[in-house]
């Protein structure tokens, strides 16, 4: 196909079964939405791994809930002796190089060659660990994700980044390694605890604030989405809209050649909130605090009106997410977070702040966030946090 023809196909295309992405650099991958992913009559997963050795990895909770169904599916659809399932520790504290090495050791002991497939079944942490292992094993092999959490389906499951924490820094080591396929079954979300759902909703709020006022308004009307009895129509709209928005935003800049990214809303202060807090807050909870702080900064810097700021913070609170963490939301630590982001982003701040609902901009320089403004934003959040 000619370069001109490829250029015409670039972008994200949605169909009834999911999304296809073709990036300007030629990277392409599929994100599927399917019912009954572990039903032996569903050929989707088997079709992606046919004729290859498969080494699957699951966390303990996923193994307890879905392990039997996963094994029954692989047993029914794949050749005997061509697959194995292994449990690995999940949780942010296990997102380490040691976990990646363990995955690679299991793969080697299982006879996985360069034509084999690593299968990650779980949330974002399992996907990050297994994806990073796949990027290095035999200089890079195919891997597939079955995303079982809301964060996994709307965030980790639609991008190409993998990584682990190291040197007291979140995602210090990692690789851009697109999954061969990313499979999402809405029914898998039904077994999630409320806290996991809320963390996923934080990432959805992120996309709504920066890109889609309609999605934001839907969440304002139903902050209990995924936690209520319903026919699932709203939840389908929310998940698919979030997936599409994220993929469309990632596509032109898949490997982050441009470090100014709107999807980094909520991800400037949150790495320090997570790390300094000993991962007491989940990732989505730290992102929520970051978004609330960024909304107040936008208000104080004259980039957003008070009503937009109020709506962002109020929605987060109505969902049940924190908007302030006394142990980490100190001027000292949040200044440290700004400097760390400035350094990580090529000595440009690229702080994403809302300018309204469904739109955002960047604060580019450290000096554009004066110490007194940061302190005032934290004071405002502290007052709101006390009334939660």
Curated annotation (Swiss-Prot):
Q: Does the keyword Nucleotide-binding apply?
A: yes
Which keywords describe this protein according to UniProt? Cobalt, Lyase, Metal-binding, NAD, Nucleotide-binding, Zinc
Family matches, as Gene3D superfamilies: 3.40.50.1970, Dehydroquinate synthase-like - alpha domain
Q: Name one Pfam family in it.
A: DHQ_synthase
Cofactors (names)? NAD(+); Co(2+); Zn(2+)
Record bears the keyword Transcription: no
GO biological process per UniProt: antibiotic biosynthetic process
Instruction: State the family named in the UniProt similarity comment for this chain.
Output: Belongs to the sugar phosphate cyclases superfamily. EEVS-like family.
The protein depicted here goes by the name 2-epi-5-epi-valiolone synthase
Protein source organism: Streptomyces glaucescens
């Amino acid at each position: 196909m000619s370069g001109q023809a490829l250029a015409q196909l670039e972008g994200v295309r949605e169909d009834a079964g999911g999304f296809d992405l073709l990036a300007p650099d030629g990277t392409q991958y599929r994100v599927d939405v399917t019912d009954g992913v572990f039903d032996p009559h569903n050929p989707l997963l088997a079709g992606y791994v046919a004729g290859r050795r498969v080494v699957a990895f699951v966390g303990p909770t996923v193994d307890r809930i879905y392990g039997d169904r996963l094994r029954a599916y692989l047993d029914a659809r794949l050749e005997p002796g061509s697959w194995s399932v292994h449990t690995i520790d999940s949780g942010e504290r296990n997102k380490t190089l040691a976990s990646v090495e363990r995955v690679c050791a299991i793969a080697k002991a299982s006879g996985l060659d360069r034509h084999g497939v690593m299968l990650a079944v779980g949330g974002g942490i399992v996907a990050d660990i297994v994806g990073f292992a796949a990027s290095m094993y035999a200089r890079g092999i195919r891997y597939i994700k079955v995303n079982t959490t809301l964060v996994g389906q709307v965030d980790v499951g639609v991008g190409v980044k993998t990584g682990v924490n190291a040197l007291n820094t979140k995602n210090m080591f990692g690789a851009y390694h697109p999954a061969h396929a990313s499979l999402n079954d809405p029914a898998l979300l039904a077994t999630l605890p409320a806290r996991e759902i809320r963390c996923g909703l934080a990432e959805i709020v992120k996309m709504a604030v920066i890109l889609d006022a309609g999605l934001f308004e839907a969440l304002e009307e139903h902050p209990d989405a995924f936690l209520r009895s319903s026919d699932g129509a709203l939840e389908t709209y929310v998940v698919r809209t979030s997936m599409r928005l994220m993929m469309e935003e990632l596509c032109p800049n898949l490997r982050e050649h441009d470090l100014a990214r709107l999807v980094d809303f909520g991800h400037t202060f949150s790495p320090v909130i997570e790390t300094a807090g000993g991962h007491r807050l989940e990732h989505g909870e730290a992102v929520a605090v970051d978004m609330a702080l960024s909304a107040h900064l936008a208000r104080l810097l004259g980039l957003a009106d008070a009503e937009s700021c109020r709506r962002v913070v109020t929605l987060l609170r109505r969902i049940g997410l924190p908007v302030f963490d006394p142990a980490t939301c100190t001027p000292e630590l949040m200044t440290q977070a700004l400097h760390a982001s400035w350094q990580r982003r090529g000595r440009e701040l690229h702080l994403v702040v809302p300018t309204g609902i469904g739109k955002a901009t960047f604060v580019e320089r450290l000096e554009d966030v004066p110490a007194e403004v940061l302190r005032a934003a934290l004071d405002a959040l502290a007052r709101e946090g006390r009334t939660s």
